[in-house]
UniProtKB/Swiss-Prot annotation:
GO molecular function: ATP binding; ATP-dependent DNA damage sensor activity; damaged DNA binding; mismatched DNA binding
Region (Disordered): 843-884
Stored InterPro entries: DNA_mismatch_repair_MutS (IPR005748), DNA_mismatch_repair_MutS-lik_N (IPR007695), DNA_mismatch_repair_MutS/MSH (IPR017261), DNA_mismatch_repair_MutS_C (IPR000432), DNA_mismatch_repair_MutS_clamp (IPR007861), DNA_mismatch_repair_MutS_core (IPR007696), DNA_mismatch_repair_MutS_N (IPR016151), DNA_mismatch_repair_MutS_sf (IPR036187)
KW ATP-binding (keyword) present: yes
Gene3D superfamilies: 1.10.1420.10, DNA repair protein MutS, domain I (3.40.1170.10), MutS, connector domain (3.30.420.110), P-loop containing nucleotide triphosphate hydrolases (3.40.50.300)
HAMAP family per the UniProt record, alphabetical: MutS
The protein's role, per its UniProt record: This protein is involved in the repair of mismatches in DNA. It is possible that it carries out the mismatch recognition step. This protein has a weak ATPase activity.
GO cellular component, as recorded: cytosol
Origin: domain of life: Bacteria
CDD domains referenced in this protein's UniProt entry, alphabetically: ABC_MutS1 (cd03284)
Coiled-coil regions, chain positions: none
Record-given protein name: DNA mismatch repair protein MutS
Keywords: ATP-binding, DNA damage, DNA repair, DNA-binding, Nucleotide-binding
Amino acid sequence: MDPALLTPMMQHYVELKRQYPHAILLYRLGDFYEMFFQDAQRVSRELELVLTGREAGAIGRVPMCGIPYHAFDRYAAQLVAKGYALAVCDQMEPADQAKGLVRREVTRVITPGTVLEEELLQARQNNYLAAVVRLKGSKQAPCRWGLAYADISTGEFWVCQSEGQEQLEQELARLQPAEVLLPTEEGLGLGLIRPGDPQKPLGLPNQYAYTLRPAEPFELAVARENLMQTYGLRSLEGLGCEGLPLAVRAAGGLLHYLEETHSPQRCVAPKTLLQPSPQGGHPLLPPPRTYQLTDYLILDAQTRRNLELTQTIREGAFVGSLLWVLDHSRTAMGGRTLRRWLLQPLRDSEQIRLRQDTIQELLENPSLRARLGSLLDSLYDLERLANRVGSGTANPRELVALGSSLGKLPQLAELVGEAKTPLLQSLQQVDPALVDLGRRIEHTLLPSPPPILTEGGLIRPGVDPELDRLRQQVEQDRQWVAQLEKSERDRTGIPTLKVGFNKAFGYYLSISRAKAHQVPKEYIRKQTLTNEERFITPELKEKEARILTAQTDINQREYELFVQLRQEAGSRAEAIRQVAQTLAAVDALFGLAEVAVQQGYTRPLLTTDRRLIIEEGRHPVVEKSLPQGLFVPNSVQLGSPHGPDLIVLTGPNMSGKSTYLRQIGLIQILAQMGSFVPARRAELGLCDRVFTRIGAVDDLATGQSTFMVEMNETANILNHAGERSLVLLDEIGRGTATFDGLSIAWAVAEYLATQVRARTVFATHYHELNQLETLLPNVANFQVVVKELQDRIIFLHQVQPGGADRSYGIEVGRMAGLPQPVIQRAEQVLALVEKHSRIGLGLRNQGKSQPAQKNCKKEPAPNRSPDPAVGDQLSLIPAPLFPD
């Protein structure tokens, strides 16, 4: 497009668009943000807005779409949620003061991962920006990768380096980043790839927004220099990432992106994200912290989904998830902390014990718990407020919220004065500077200031002498105007005379047209309306000028005082953030204590051995959804020296097998996140991973059938589980033919019991697997029992030793309302199948076994040496599942 064919304004628009080709450019024109060309068409389609046009010069009309400036947050939130980046161009001077074209500049770039505005964020979820650097692997070695992620709204910054594509995808699934940065060496051009776009980076899920960046900021030397310069370091040893080059590269690329999207030339805030405040202080993002995957209990995406940790499987709803049961925290920052703990349980028994101790103290002191809850209720989101003041973007109401929250710190310190646990004791140490800052904010700002900075109404009386003088002058002049109405009525004899004001004409004298003949000669007619005439006088205009000038000075002075106060708060951002993190942890543990009291949870004993003992365990979500006392508790014991490693669980459909599996997994996760658990007693060995294979779904996007998905997930478990893992399997093999399914189920159970030795519960309708108990010493049979009546069955939901020999599928079909002819025919077919089943005959006849071939090719797996004693047992497995 030839710029010479465009109007000057459109030339400027096109020039800015070339600087931000991958963002939607919102161009401020008066009271609207306008978009043109393809941006207008895209936004019109995405937001269902009217697409209009505008004359652009010699090329004629071009597509145009606009949003009102006062509705910017609402529309911007929708676009960011859809994965778009926004470049916001604002007017930098009033239109009536411009000499020629109004000066406009891009003041901020908003991308899905760089959002700071409260309206664009979810209160109880982090908004992570991630950066990934990958080195391709080979058949002999897995790929290596570095990951950095940050939430610039809360000040979190973490780095990690590991290997394996699956492990990288698991971390991304845990974080659910709003945006992922990749260097262009990943094989695609620069730009933003929105969620669901088929043009995704090779080998990565397409559910995230990817931003392809220049490779240079991700180079090791450049990234090291960026990190050291940003944080004033001479080396990276203090950060713990000196020996993690891929993590350093990812962190450097992430910092460069933030510098670019929040650079001083593009930001109207007093300071930028990574620029220290004038008073010293720290950058908005603190130095990154390093972690290892092995520090935490690993939960893959399938396990998080199957156990419904944060949302239900069917509706994707929060209500009905484990987090719904647990989240009794009183603040948004406490809710975010609890969510992180749930998705990243610990493996460090000492850290777990510290959390348990805090919950225990709150449980044993109801008065402390009640008063603490009341104080937490009065706190605002200090984590995000810290970063809002740190970035210089906090509005007056946010600063008032900060002052109010800081003012509660002395009360919190007094409340926990006799606390015994370290976390509560840490609240006793209050930074006097933060208390003083809170008082200064409360003494400076009015309690309910307007959201707009430049319209006054911010500062309390008595704070600034010059401001008080100006306000007094305005008040005196306004009193004169008010008295003018009475004096002019008396002087003119017009009782309906009024003094009015509007932005177009300022002050005026309003007189009805019926009395217009009584108007004094010195009145100057300004406007004629249907029923009234409006006049001004020289004296009234003089007072108006004084009032308006003084009001402008007042607004400017209030703005200056507010910015000074915000900068003072910004210099304390790091201290506020540290206090906020402590309070968030206390709030999360307070919520867990509340749940423990309300639901009758107990403190689990965490051990370093493999024992998993749960007495009268309960499913936390199902229990809460039922009337009190109706849930039937059940026990389990795995991994003991003389107990089973694998339980074969049989029982009817609808009896509660899946609930039993899930509650075991949930109790283990709750224990390792530091929570109390829904059980009478629990003694749990620390797990390294929890695996689940529950439910059946297909994956149409990748062309995988239900059974293929099931086999992929099962293969993942068999190749990665170890003896410290917990494995929960439900109906392996049901998605294919009976013989194939039974064979696979048998082989999987056998492999888990003899090779992996993970603590496993294997729910199945293949009752033939009950034979494993007699063949393998570390396998036991359990069943979910029912009570049979003459015409129906009653589900008791009780798990007891022994194997079931019926699934009662026809009875469940009858309960579901299948037509009676179908039920009768099913019973006839069942009788024939049971009588002539070659599977049943083979098992009853106990034929000879055929040992598995040792030279079969299989997926790579951890090096496992079979126990010779177990090998001897394999020869006892009945072979004629497929008799000759």
